[in-house]
Regions:
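Short, conserved phosphate/pyrophosphate- and ester-handling motifs at nucleotide-, phospho-/glycolipid
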Residues: 42, 168, 304
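Short, acidic/hydrophobic/Gly-rich beta-strand patch recurrent on exposed beta strands
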Residues: 20-26, 149-152, 217-219, 362
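Structural signature of eukaryotic scaffold interfaces centered on beta-propeller domains
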Residues: 206-208
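Terminal RNA-binding accessory module
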Residues: 1-74, 78, 153, 375, ...
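Rossmann-like S-adenosyl-L-methionine
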Residues: 2-3, 10-16, 224-471
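Internal alpha/beta scaffold segment
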Residues: 157-201, 222-259, 266
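Short, solvent-exposed loop/turn elements at beta->coil junctions and helix N-caps
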Residues: 119-126, 193, 202, 452-455
Length: 471
């Protein structure tokens, strides 16, 4: 096999989260294993060999030659085009079967025969479950049709129409199609990052699954740069006209906020230089397990609220006895969701989170829920545990819910040295969990109970929840 050549083969398995294992037999009859991202079990694919070193071969997917036996016609026209869903045409039960096998394989060295396994729990809703989406104004290809949608898989520039995205809330589709048509009719161009021309950048939408409250935020340049094509006053009038047009639409939910975010940053990200409320308010309320949470445009909050209830119920059940009247650390606490769910039974809960805005939101939400035994600290977990060593009471149990990269080695060692009887590790990336388990095991902890929650149906994502016990 030679680098740069195109080969075909069948995908025999898939590693977490999207690494298809393709086997190719060369002219000498020797079988070669090649990892091809986004190639799915059962498919026959064509790929270009991009890496061949020390027995590790990688390929770039070029074409699906034959569908998998597990595939049907996908419910989304952008299947395989956008970077969202990995399994758009697969039967849902098959997708969770694949994810379950992937995580079990990663954790096999840490799962003894007596470990209690609670299985993989499905999301209560599999379609339209996302309560937050960030859409980009752009063109389908260079100088192609203008569109409001999602980035094409593997592209920084090409955008695909996402008005009928399967996993986004139904109201988002109406917002996208209407907004796209509104500005197309007005002849307003999108912002060209390389040329610094144009006005429109993003559309940020959020919705609460329980309350139905809906927020729409349009992101544009300020108009201070004359190359934008419109000045600040013209952009302001345009945004107000857009707002008025939204108020005439019939949503399933209730539109409670229309915002205008100004962003002059060169980065292709939603960065807020200034935010104006055009209608309603710049926040809404979501409910989880009987508690209320105030959500702003930039709040970190689970995108699948109903799935989050399943996950957090699992966390609570694992340490319910330890929490009763005890002191709890909720590390990497985000907006303090887990902390507040555990707080009613605990003596005290201390949350640590590096994002200051999230900490302020956690404090505000705790006050909203009448919880006086929650304390939230802003800072890096390791540094906080080091600097507050004398003032923090030793915990009776610990919950860690780190970002995708997992817990850093210094922080993990510090956490394990508390020596609590039980810990819960919530992981959104099973490879990071498997890596961290090596140190966790070495420090005398083992998994005694675990389960998974499919928070993100049809994507490669899966949440894993492990109860760890000190031997």
């Amino acid at each position: 096999m030679k680098k740069g050549e195109v080969y075909t083969g069948y995908v025999e398995s898939i590693g977490f989260p999207n690494k298809g294992c393709v086997y190719v037999t060369d002219e000498d009859g020797e079988r070669h294993r090649v990892t091809v991202k986004n190639a799915l079990p059962g498919q026959k694919v064509a790929f270009r060999l991009t890496k061949k070193r020390n027995g590790n071969s990688e390929g770039l997917l070029k074409e699906v030659v034959e569908k998998s036996e597990f595939e049907t016609d996908p419910a989304c026209k952008n299947a395989g085009k956008c970077g969202g869903c990995l399994y758009p045409g697969f039967d849902y039960e098959k997708t969770i079967e694949i994810k379950e096998a992937q995580v079990k394989k990663l954790l096999e060295n840490y799962l003894s025969d007596d470990v209690i396994y609670d299985g993989i729990k499905s999301s209560p809703v599999c379609d339209g479950y996302r309560g937050k989406m960030e859409y980009t104004f752009g063109d389908e290809f260079l100088d192609g049709p203008k569109v409001l949608g999602l980035h094409k898989r593997g592209s920084f520039h090409d955008i695909v129409d996402a008005s009928d995205c399967r996993i986004a809330d139904e109201d988002f589709g109406l917002l996208v199609s209407h907004t796209s048509g509104f500005f197309s009719e007005k002849g307003v161009d999108f912002y060209h990052r390389m040329k610094h021309t144009g006005v429109l950048r993003h559309l940020l939408v959020r919705k609460a699954a329980k309350t139905g409250e809906l927020m729409a935020a349009l992101v544009t340049v300020s108009g201070k740069d004359t190359m934008a094509g419109l000045d600040s006053d013209e952009i302001e009038r345009l945004c107000n006209d857009w707002k008025e047009s939204l108020l005439s639409l019939k949503f399933k939910g209730k539109l409670t906020g229309v915002l205008h975010i100004i962003n002059d940053s060169p980065a292709d990200a939603i960065i807020c230089d200034r935010m104006d409320v055009l209608y309603g308010k710049d926040w809404f309320t979501e409910e989880l397990l009987g508690l209320k949470f105030k959500i702003t445009p930039f709040s970190f909050f689970q995108t699948n609220s109903l799935g989050a209830e399943v996950l957090y119920s699992l966390v609570r059940s694992y340490i319910s006895e330890d929490v009763k009247g005890g002191k709890v650390f909720d590390l990497y606490s985000g907006t303090g969701t887990i902390a507040q769910i555990l707080a009613p039974a605990a003596k005290k809960v201390t949350g640590v989170e590096i994002v200051e805005e999230a900490v302020e939101a956690a404090k505000e939400n705790a006050k909203l829920n009448g919880l006086e035994n929650c304390d939230f600290i802003a800072g890096d977990v390791f540094k906080v545990l080091e600097s507050y060593a004398d003032s923090l009471d030793s915990p009776d149990c610990i919950v860690v819910d780190p970002p995708r990269d997992g817990v850093g080695p210094k922080a993990l060692l510090k956490i394990l040295n508390y020596g609590v009887k039980h810990m819960v590790y919530v992981s959104c990336k099973a490879t990071s969990l498997a890596r961290d388990m090596e140190m966790i095991n070495a420090k005398g902890y083992r998994i005694v109970r675990w389960g998974m929650v499919d928070m993100f149906p049809f994507t490669g994502g899966i949440e894993t929840c492990c109860l760890l016990e000190r031997l």
